[in-house]
Amino acid sequence: MDFIAGEILYFNKPLTWTSFDLVNKFRYKLSRKLKVKKIKVGHAGTLDPLATGVMIVCTGRATKRIDEFQYQTKEYIATLKLGETTPSFDLEKEIDAVYPTEHITRELVEEVLKTFVGTIQQIPPVFSACKVEGKRAYELARKGEEVELKSKTLVIDELELLECDLPVIKIRVVCSKGTYIRALARDIGKALGSGAHLIGLERTRIGEVTLDMCMSPEEIDDFLEQNVVKIEEEK
């Protein structure tokens, strides 16, 4: 494999790792193996630290294709806890409000999910990488500053209820670029006349790339050992 000319690799990001952690670890190991000081490495779509799953990583000149992958549809398996909200809409922050769930039934959940299929408007979470006047929203939010984000037009292609063990539900989401599953959880909770936050998230597909095609960070060393071409210096 020619990592400088450009390769496209698939990883399964572990829980608690940032997307940068994964890219940084691979870049470090790759540059050491190639014995070069610098090599371009980038990813095609951020995953939150509390999410796991598919990440596409590009090297060398293949980093020019990152936008192409970012615009492909993505599939997620999300687990939502109904009746409770957090400022981050996931487990990163503590529960800040509790809502009733006694009125929620499986039938109501299925009816509400149908209303989110198609073109929707979504306001991103304030704890996100969206920019506000040149600054990341999460940087402002962590300082306690008020952050106002504009809604974005998104497309939800599929939304399926996989499990319903109230107040916990598990859903499968197929969506367009820019969709925040945390924000979707918030909006589903509101539509149910309650609240909700994410307690689990796995990205299972980007375009045609599925989880079973991905390697774990623990496999990087063996992968590089097998795929870095040892080129002898010409004398």
UniProtKB/Swiss-Prot annotation:
Xref: CDD domains: PseudoU_synth_EcTruB
Single GO term (MF): tRNA pseudouridine(55) synthase activity
Keywords: Isomerase, tRNA processing
Parts forming coiled coils: none
Active-site positions on this chain: 48 (nucleophile)
Signal peptide: none
Pfam families from the UniProt entry: TruB_C_2, TruB_N
Keyword Membrane: no
GO biological process: mRNA pseudouridine synthesis; tRNA pseudouridine synthesis
Primary role: Responsible for synthesis of pseudouridine from uracil-55 in the psi GC loop of transfer RNAs.
tRNA processing recorded as keyword: yes
Entry EC no(s): 5.4.99.25
Transmembrane segments: none
Gene: truB
InterPro entries referenced in this protein's UniProt entry, alphabetically: PsdUridine_synth_cat_dom_sf, PsdUridine_synth_N, tRNA_psdUridine_synth_TruB, TruB_C
Source species: Parabacteroides distasonis (strain ATCC 8503 / DSM 20701 / CIP 104284 / JCM 5825 / NCTC 11152)
Top-level taxon of origin: Bacteria
Record's protein name: tRNA pseudouridine synthase B
Disulfide bridge partners, by residue number: none
Reactions this protein catalyses: uridine(55) in tRNA = pseudouridine(55) in tRNA
Family: Belongs to the pseudouridine synthase TruB family. Type 1 subfamily.
EC top class, as a word: isomerase
